[in-house]
Amino acid sequence: MNQKILTASLAALVLTTGAFSVQAESTPPNFYSLNEVVVTASRTPKKKIDTNADVAVVTADEIAQKHYDDVSQAVRNIPGVVIANSSANGQNYNSNKLYINGSNKVVLLVDGVRMNTNGLTVGSSVTLAQHVNMNSIDHIEVLKGSASTLYGSDAQGGVINIITKKAKENQINTAVTISASSFDGEKYNLYNEGNKDGFFWAVEAQKELQGDYKDGHNNKVISHLNAESYNVKLGKDLGNDSSLVFTYNKYKSDYQRPDQAFMHTGGGSTTRDYGTKDNDAISLQYKAKITDALSNELTVYRNRTTFRDNYKSAGESWFMDMKSTGFTDQLTWKNDQHAVVGGIEYYKDEIPYFYSYASTSGAQGHHASNTAFYIQDDWKITDKWNVTPGIRFDHHSTFGNHTTPAITVGYKANENTNYYLGYKEFFVAPDLYQLFDHYSGNKDLDPQEGSTWQIGMNKQIDDSLSMSANLYRTHAKNIISYSFDTWKYENLGKTDSAGGSLSLTKQFNPNWSATFGYTYTHINSSDSQKANLNGFLPKHTLDLGITYVHDTFDASLYGRAILGREGGKGFTGRIPSEYKNYSVWNFSMNYKPVDYAKVFFKVNNIFDSYYCDVGTFTASTTDWYSMPGRNYELGVTFQF
């Protein structure tokens, strides 16, 4: 559909629905309070204020208010989280990066099912931007800090758990969303959920189009996207809190990206690189309540990605097929004093096909597997004191046996205040790309090992104000990083990192609310890199959000400021100021003229900031991937 026709049609819909305006009760935004229940930190339901961890939550209401396009946008403004894209969104190319507490070792779960494919990208084994079906999400839990005992070695930085919706009994709901946006953007989404006679389901389909964009200096940047995604969840309630759930997720896209970008020189590449993605994931999950105290959860899954980048340039193409298969079997036993979680976890990563720069040598045909046993006891010693010891045993097919203990002590000062202190060890095996890529791979890599200390608090200061604060210190040896001296992945010795974050949520009255976040990050420098991963991570990050709700209208203003991101070693004098320090502000508003329709309008990058998430990798070039300037989106959602 031509975008001008789509925009005009949407405007007509807005005017039509507005003619039947009705009033509704004023409701405050649904912040996830400290008394709500989360599951990711301990793999058992627990009030957030009682969780001995730093957990942030993004609710379905927040997603609906701010119209996040994908999961990466939803978690981008959480203190401690850094998202870095080399395009308008993370769906172009495959080197987008995710960091939590300074580490890119993050586990992604959907309803507790592992979605990682180790070696999938240069930056991370997690591709949040491809999780675009947002209507099916109930909330997103972000666990910040090492969680290796329960989730494995690649949870050094933390865990992101996407919890999907389940329709209420005897209900069927349908939503249709259509929107048009700047840069020839179009989006069409259909969502249906239901729960009848013990069967429940959720089905979502989305089509998204986007063209070339202009950055904050009005430079044209090559960027094309034609993406389709589908989610299916089918479940059966078996009675006695038991269920069987099947899920299937599909993502497919054609994209274009610039061969190079020159933010520093104010120009841009005119060479288009063409790529495709074809990813899917399938899982089966069985939950059984054996007794009042004992329950079991068994999951089997398979994740697959097919990636073709720059396929029209045979000498510079990069193709990669990856597959991860695995299962988990967990037992949970509870009484008044103990919540014991134990289980077995197995996964296998493999690269069936690999082609890079006219060669299939190296990574193709390689695979690695990991088998783990874990146990953790959340022991309530008194009404105020609790301790959570845990241990994990891993057997890696290449790197052998490793044991990682953990312990956390919690002190519940009163009903509104909880303190915790934790120590956790981790073991991170090199992924297949780091080991076997024929250009940058290094078969002599050793696993990265280390430990993290963490101290924090969760406090409900009064009925309208809550706070979470956290400090951490990590020591690691055999750091696995790309070396610009050898042009390969190397073990770069030891490093220490430290940081912390503060989150505040304030409800001023039924109409006005605000959030504030601050993050500090410091990672020691080395002989080959500057501090903070060669100047990639900012020293300071500020997050601020303000929301207004009244009757059928709501609006949100939210932004992030990046401060003290210095850039890599050897870049002195050529690093744009927009890379070191910048802020980006967004605005969204919603109006519900009738019960069955909601009109929304969104402005991204209100002040037309000129900035980039990702800088150049080497000192010999001037590649700076500038991000979109001010842009708009207008849409409507119909609910049945």
Predicted region positions:
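Outer-membrane beta-barrel signature, preferentially recognizing the C-terminal barrel domain
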Residues: H264-K289, N416-N418, K424-K477, S481-Q507, ...
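Face-selective signature of the C-terminal outer-membrane beta-barrel domain
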Residues: D237-K252, D273-N414, I461, L465-Y472, ...
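Surface-exposed extracellular loop regions of Gram-negative outer-membrane beta-barrel proteins
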Residues: K252-D254, Q260-T265, E350, Y355, ...
